């Protein structure tokens, strides 16, 4: 499906891959199976242009799914986008569901994107796929780690620790910007939010791993305990806010103001953070909620 998107004249330059599939299929060694497709629309930063293009993008994606034999069961109609649910015949028998999440609010890539070739899966390999920069993928994954407590996020977070050459100042700035957009107050977040559920791991993650990954009795509980401790130690700096970082969050969450110059990244990155539609929407919501627009 990713290959078909990359070949499509409408979608190839407008949709960029992010999330667990981008991380595992393009940057890691396929340590876990990740089949859902998370995409950002990046065709235009301007909202009016996006709204003009969206029907064409949605129609192209619908056409592509249908041509590949998928039966579209749900198409999102929210302003921000949402999940496409499509049924297909599984090679293991019966039907399965492919989820494609298209986000129309994350139109501003913070660190760019690049065409990449996937890791090989048997004799298959996707090529020329537009993938979000690894730093933004990692930042999004770490925000998800503390926000939704999914076993797959904990697994991915541990694997992220093995990736060399990352610029963690970039990642921290992106974590703060993305985290500020969420429903929770990022200023209250701490390492205590990093945790794992053995039952959820067995039910939802284990089936995406090699069969013998947690074969021994007590393996799951031991792995969670070790991984949570490791991630809390290594990611603690994300929650240790400087005065400027706290002021950035205060501006967004108290006054509905974006001041990216408070963040310790290059000027061009600050400009992109300042142009994030999701952050602008969050600030608009804060001002309305606090009666600051009157």
Where are these regions (language model features)?
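Structured mid-to-C-terminal alpha-helical surface segments
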Residues: 1-15, 25-37, 41-294
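Active-site glycine-centered loops adjacent to acidic/histidine catalytic or metal-binding residues
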Residues: 20
